[in-house]
Amino acid sequence: IIDIKKSKYKKEEWNTFLKEGQELTIPAGSEEIVEIDAGEEMTGYLHLLLEAGKGSKIEILQAESYIYDELCGPAQVPLKKDRCDFVNGHLEGYTDEYLAGGFGTEEQAEEYETFWFRTFRFIHLKIKTGEEDLTLKSFYYEETGYPLKIATKVKTSDESLDKIWEISARTLQRCMHETYEDCPYYEQLQYAMDSRVQILY
């Protein structure tokens, strides 16, 4: 958890839920809003397991970074400075919405899974319960991508370049699925020159 916008639970309790599967129960007629940091950009299928909570509305927004209200450039796009700045920035991105059916039990959870992989570094999770308590049993992602064997490495006297190598390898990993793609978050298209550079690795 990078930030709690609105919650009856503390950050430690949310982290225990995410990392260890300790259930959280959200009372009827209440709202929870938290933001989660995956640590790096990921591609994966999101899974949310629920018990009861019929009529609860769940929004899962996926974002690459925090952005600012300030617009820049001729296209007037939101400014990205410190991509982890949750104090001054906010998250914008693609959102999945789910209305809980309420049929999840202690033995057999109701499960929401995305139909296609999602790309994210940050997730804005908003839950608004209806007339029933909702128990969150688990929330995780199943990482996906074409297996990439890192066959080379770069070593220099400048240690700051090690991070650039890691970012480059991770970028390639995140852009390999059924096809090579220019980026996993936006177009997900197979442009000729992007693909050629990727194939050469």
Predicted features by range, described:
Residues 197-201:
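Well-ordered alpha-helical scaffold segments within catalytic/enzyme domains
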Residues 1-182, 194:
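Extracellular/oxidizing-compartment recognition motifs
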